Amino acid sequence: MSMKFLTGLQDLLGLYETGTAASSPASPIPPTSPAMFAVPPQQQSHSAATSVRKKTCQDANSSGEDPNGRIRQCSHARTVSFPADMDLITGYHEAPSSLFHSYHDSQRVIDSSEILTAYREACQRRQCAPSAAVEKQIGYFHKSPDTRQELLSLKGERVSHAQMEALEEIFKRVQFNTIDFEYTFLDDDCAISLGEMIEFYDSCVRLNLSFNKQIDMRGWTTIFRSIRHAVSLQMLNLRYTNLNDRSIPALCKMARAQPSASLTCLHLENTQMSGKNLLVLICALKNNTGLRELYLGDNGLQPTDGSHIYQLITSNSSLQLLDLRNNSIGDSGVRHICDGLRHREAVEKSSLSAMVLWNNNVTGASMDSLAEALIENTKIETLNIGNNNLGVEGIARLKPALASNSHLHRLGLQNTGINCEGAIILAECIADNIALLRVDIRDNPIALAGLLALHSAMKMNTSITLLNIDASCVKLSSEKVREYQDEFERYFREIQTYCDRNKDDVLKRLTVTFDDEEGDSGVEKKDGNECEGEDNKDRQDTPAETENGVSSNESKLENEEVGVSKPESNNNEKSPLMASSSTSKLSRKERHQRFVRSSSLTCTETVHDIHDRLREMSGSTHSLDAAIAAAASNSTMQNLLTVSYGSNPGPLDSSSNSESMKTIKKSFTVTAASSSSLPLAEWGSLPALPQASPSSTPVVRKLRRFSVSPSSSVFDVATTSSAASSTASSPIPENSIALPVRPSTLAIGIPIIGSVPAGPSSAPLILVEDHKDGPITSNQISDTERRISEEIERQKKDEQEIEKSCRSVIRDLLNYVEYEEKSQVERKASLLLRNTFSRPNPEELLRNLRLSEATGSTTPRTPLTPSRYVQVFNINSFLKLYFIKACILRVLEIAEELEGESDEQICQSVIRCLVRDVLQAEKNELRSTLDRRRRHNSVRNSPV
């Protein structure tokens, strides 16, 4: 600093050393053009001095013998050099990527035993029990690394955060078509881990998270972000989940993503997706080009929500299936939807081909709007308006669209109030219709007249391959036509024969034959879904045929439509072969797997225990889990950790996954830590309140990506000792390849089963694993177990002391209350006995009786008069007997009153009185406070 100051002062004053100035040959450079670049004499002298100074400094610095010596003069010409950039980098590594993205090794073989061992060791490290259903499914994995495994299901099991983390050992080695976490009570931590694994490992094509109401905003945010970045995920089932105002923006952000995510099917049944939430979602889906199927059933949609559906139909160009079952849209909402179908944008750009309006309080009044929409919009192929009170009026208004329609293939009219008159109108429509493939008119009061009309219509129809009608229509209601019973049954069977005839005709038109010159065997492929098409026109697959998870009777109906002939080998005959377009569609449909619900004409509920599930999910179960975990003993923990690794699971059959498919129906047993008087529903609604201890040292769970867990919101950067079990996991073989693991910014601490909570701030005592190189010694294991046992013993002693003091206080209170109650009862009893057994005076009673008869008044109440009687007879003997009987009855009542009540009942009554007094005092105080405020306000507001 001082050197720069002196140099600047020297330049300002022009003071230089004499020898240096004299020896300097530098001179100012004259300007090239004196006329244009004339410099005043003062500036010329200053520039000359500056040049002399720079030259002198350069000579002085260059003439030094020691380059590392002390610099005595300033030089602005010195430079700083650095080594080459490549020499600065000592090493680097690529960003972590999953095994399935980094390379493709065709020689790799999936080893089920290795996956099973890794999964068990992961469960052991995280102090949790492995799932028996998962172990069975691991044994069923095929060995091809190029093909995804079919299914990983934990349906109906309680999955904790530790168990979810242990599943990473499976996800890092195997990919699946379907991952089913239905009804597994996932929370935010489980959802965050699952979302990160799905995004990193690209684990599945279809993901089922239905019936999980404990997931909140943090979990949904991670799930939706992972789905937005997932490459293969196509179907997401969020049925009966807790989507609220805070989590819906994350869903909308995923829907607005450009380019659109790979998601094509979204189930949002019973997620409160109505009103504002529905409007926000539809605004996000306006420009979405990837979604094909949207399920919005059981959301309580109102007629006003029909305008939101109108915006979705007119703006979205990729949606093919819209399911609105079990709502309350009504006639006005249906009119809004029909206006959207008739809109010019929808007619030109919309891809909507299937719509489900099952059970929406629709009547026949809105069927004229629906008929006009079907006439103008020629893209609707499947329409299900079942379970609505349409009646004959609705069918009559729908008749113009059904008679002239050439594009509607499937019509659902189940339980719509169609009688014989409606069946006759419907028969008139289908007689000449060449587009309908399936009509469902089950659960309607159709009798013999309707059956005859449908029989005549099906005799002329050439397109319908399946007509669903109840067999009860054949039953005769009159004895006069009993002799025609066999004939009516024959008509019913002939309807099925006509359907089979139409199916065979379509198959014949879709097949071609050729001469087999090389002698290869000929194979005829037939598919009922393909026979539902037009002649040789390549139609687009409708969602109703490629739906997931149909009910039992629906599967039977679909199977009736499908006919596959066995391969026949004949070298001399002609071999029929399906057309190329049909073959491609057949293979495409065979690859599509059924997963959840059916969107075809049958909309009955497929979950048989849905009411039990809803009752179980009505309250939070974290308190139950905490109580059960806290009550687990060390012996139970050792049994969970010492899992037999030698047993290899056998191959799975159809019933091997029965454990995971069962729904949780067991009642939870609460240990001594919880009161047994409370029912299950009340325990489900209570929050988790860990016990407090005097010395509290909150220990922290460190979560990846800096996410905060609601169960432990107190954080500490200090690490704790590592927790290891006696049965240490076997080391990984040296020849095994280290699989890449998804990145985690922070370590995760998993609580040990049986650990006690510590701290008044309800932060649980959690041991965080310290992943270090090298094996775990026996000394570390013994120290850890000793510390845990000491902590448990100390906590038990504190609890015993607190319980002892509480018992003593309660005992004193009970003794005092019992004494007060007994003394009061005894005083009352003595008074009553004294009054009752006092000697009666007959003369006085007779005098009072005569006086009452003269005046017409009733007998006065005296201590000698019994309370139960109001009249005294004038017979002395009867009076004596009467008084003796009254005294005996009163004595018996007092004895029963004294002996009937137990100590517990007395305590309960006293406690009720105390609580009632406290509440009454608070009520009076609140009332007086309000009165004072009113008086104060009235005085302040009164005019002066």
From Swiss-Prot:
The organism's lineage? Eukaryota, Metazoa, Ecdysozoa, Nematoda, Chromadorea
Q: Where is this region: Disordered?
A: 42-71, 517-598
| Skewed-composition ranges (Basic and acidic residues) | 522-542
The record lists the organism as: Caenorhabditis elegans
Instruction: List, alphabetically, the Gene3D superfamilies matched.
Output: Ribonuclease Inhibitor
Identify the keywords attached in UniProt to this record, alphabetized.
Leucine-rich repeat, Repeat
Q: Where is the composition biased (Polar residues)?
A: 543-554, 567-585
Positions with biased composition (Basic residues) = 586-595
Give the InterPro entries listed for this entry.
Leu-rich_rpt (IPR001611), LRR_dom_sf (IPR032675), PP1-Reg/Actin-Interact_Protein (IPR051279)
Name of the protein in its database record: Protein phosphatase 1 regulatory subunit 37 homolog
Report which superkingdom the organism of origin falls in.
Eukaryota
Q: Where are the LRR repeats?
A: 203-224, 232-255, 262-282, 290-311, 318-338
Any Pfam family matching the protein: LRR_6
Protein family (similarity comment): Belongs to the PPP1R37 family.
